[in-house]
């Protein structure tokens, strides 16, 4: 199976739920990472603040930092090749990269509201 390597900018944690500010993009991406792992995808994440040597030891990450600086992160490598930089991918993009079908989420066929129910 393919391998995704994520080089995150310096941050306190990778979940997006750090301190008083919640970064919804990171929250979504963290959920998507767990979704991928649940489907057997191997993922490595490195945080510039906590694992700077991982950036130095990886030629692609090192060259990227030299050219774009930390403000250009995140950097995503798929099997060692750059697939995205500067933003986190959406779940649909991740699914496409790994050939994983997205589950369709549909609307309920009937509503609980109306009629003689008291649910609303």
Curated annotation (Swiss-Prot):
One of its GO terms (molecular function) is DNA binding. GO terms for biological process: negative regulation of DNA-templated transcription; response to arsenic-containing substance. Transmembrane segments: none annotated. It holds the Pfam family ArsD. Keywords: Arsenical resistance, DNA-binding, Plasmid, Repressor, Transcription, Transcription regulation. Signal peptide: none annotated. The keyword Cell membrane does not apply. Inducer-independent trans-acting repressor of the ars operon. This is Arsenical resistance operon trans-acting repressor ArsD. The gene is arsD.
